[in-house]
């Protein structure tokens, strides 16, 4: 995780990346555990990934659903610009992840030269069911919130009436989990 916590139920991803880390032991990947087929049930991914003592069934389900979407690397010297990091990622994927049916995917990265082009790509992302886009400047990686990486999202406000609630699950039991709204 980004806080250094080990996930116990992503062995299928670890196994796929093991040859890469054998050759590049100091490489740090930036990405997220995701599956676009579960875009409306992100809690499913979270519940699978956070299991501390996964059963064989949990491992099997995670292997069929949880993917690593890889979008950047953190280099040792932190002096490589984003466009060069992207090229390196594509080289690594070609060398180490040669078959497309594996749980490690490179996130599509496209250069844009104008707000209109960024808007067109963003609109295509929304039409594809994604929640937004990320705009990265061609700068070195910063391990913090940065102007060099901006979310591009559309927002809409709606009014709703709270008609109920659902109790939290697991360690959140006994607390408010979510509201039911109309």
Where are these predicted regions, by residue range?
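Covalent nucleotidyltransferase
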Residues: 1-99
């Amino acid at each position: 995780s980004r806080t250094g916590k080990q996930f116990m139920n992503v062995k299928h991803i670890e196994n796929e990346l093991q040859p890469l880390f054998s050759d590049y032991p100091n490489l740090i990947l930036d990405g997220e555990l995701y599956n676009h087929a579960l875009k409306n049930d992100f809690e499913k991914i979270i519940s699978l990934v956070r299991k501390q003592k996964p059963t064989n069934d949990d491992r099997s389900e995670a292997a069929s659903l949880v993917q690593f979407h890889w979008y950047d690397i953190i280099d040792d010297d932190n002096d490589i610009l984003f466009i060069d990091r992207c090229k390196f990622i594509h080289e690594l994927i070609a060398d180490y992840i040669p078959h497309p049916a594996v749980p490690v995917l490179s996130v599509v990265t496209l250069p844009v030269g104008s707000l209109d082009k960024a808007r067109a790509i963003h609109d295509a992302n929304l039409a594809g069911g994604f929640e937004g886009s990320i705009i990265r400047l061609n700068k070195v990686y910063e391990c913090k919130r940065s102007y060099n990486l901006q979310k591009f999202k559309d927002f809409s406000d709606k009014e709703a009436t709270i008609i109920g609630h659902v109790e939290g699950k697991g360690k959140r039991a006994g607390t408010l989990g979510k509201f039911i709204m109309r």
